[in-house]
Amino acid sequence: MAISLITSLLFSLPQQWQPVVLTGLLPVIVSLVLLARKGRLKMPPGPEQVPLLGNLHQLAGPQPHRALRDLARVHGPVMRLRLGKASAVVLTSAEAAWEALRGHDLDCCTRPVSAGTRRVTYGMKNVAFAPYGAYWREVRKLLMVELLSARRVKAAWYARHEQVSVTKPVVKFDFIHYCCMGKPVALDEHILSLSDGIIGTVAFGNIYGSDKFSQNKNFQHALDDVMEMLSGEGSSAEDLQLPAAVGRLVDRLTGFAARRERIFRQLDSFFEMVIEQHLDPNRAPPENGGDLVDLARKPRVLKKVQAEIRAAVGVNGRVQPDDITKLSYLRKVVKETLRLHPPTPLLLPRETMRHIQISGYDVPAKTRIYVNAWAIGRDPASWPDEPEEFNPERFEANEIDFKGEHPELMPFGTGRRICPGMAMAMANVEFTLANLLFAFQWSLPEGTTPDNVCLEEEGRLVCHRKTPLVLVPTVYRHGLE
């Protein structure tokens, strides 16, 4: 109606004035057309927004994946949010996530840019955060061919074997001490040291474990700061609904800009040291701990998986490459752990490069796509048989796997942006867990029952347990030969 009125008024003017008036009204006409088109879009439902923040205040806690699951129960599995100045859609069902990540893979396979991410990734040069394009394709190809291909993962068995040989005397001493004293042991540092050593050996032929950076508190704090910066939606005023210049000024006044620069310089100096010493700092929190916590709470499952491992290994005293392929129940335990405790509960966000539709809703270009893998893993629609319970037997009746081919279980994502390190990570997890379960019996500390074990996690980008993993080891007769 407004456009018709403008047209009528335009043609009522003298002919010589019409081009001048039309030029002046052109921006108004374009805006009216866009508004009319936007009014016809079927946008996903979502909670009310507040000025400047949008919905950021609803995700301010240490467990945004839980907060988003609760919001989705009210607004549905396809939910619209505004995170500062960024439009976002959160997907909390397997069907919606599969439609977006596989059905529209090419349409939404780039990454969003934020002030913090841009700085600590050297201008979005990190392969995980780089936007889709020629640079990302070339870097990912190089990574997959030279380090993370199936051939390289298989060839890296020497690293896992060597790391166990190097660190096992230390682990022996600590664990035997605790076994003799009947005391619980905090496993996080041991597992982290082993994981770091394997990665360092594979990447550079050097070991760096408990005697180096994995015990360096400054290094760990720097990595924690980086993770917070990478996941901190709205931490920078530049990410809010403010003009860019105003956002930068606010960041300087609040000290955020100085903190961001300090974190970047810490990270940069560490990388310089890594280059000089041929060490690789890239590592996620150890994933084996989640397996052991759940296993300690389920003695039946623990006994069953240990029996399988010990039957396969026999009296060799150490898990060998051929043994891993025989451990079908161990693989089910790992699947169940990834279902309940995905390492990245909210998969790294994607961003739409063009207008798409998800579950009948319109999703415009430049919209961020978040997939709540944690909520999907506990969704009764996908897992009808007690989804909150740890039960590896649920995988006996199906072929569901974590490799990105089943919408119910996508802890590493799917499509073009699936985690390139999945195969290497799982080889390390299965190897480490098999050795720990073979060598020791594990039980909960005195006074701790399966019902009062804290399973809550914290963290925004990568989650870890709120409380340390503490278990009581008992030596198995062949485990330390």
Each language-model region and where it sits:
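Terminal signal-anchor or tail-anchor transmembrane helices
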Residues: 2-40, 427
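Central I-helix of cytochrome P450 enzymes
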Residues: 195, 199, 204, 263, ...
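Cytochrome P450 heme-thiolate "Cys pocket" and heme-binding signature region
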Residues: 359, 396-429, 456-458
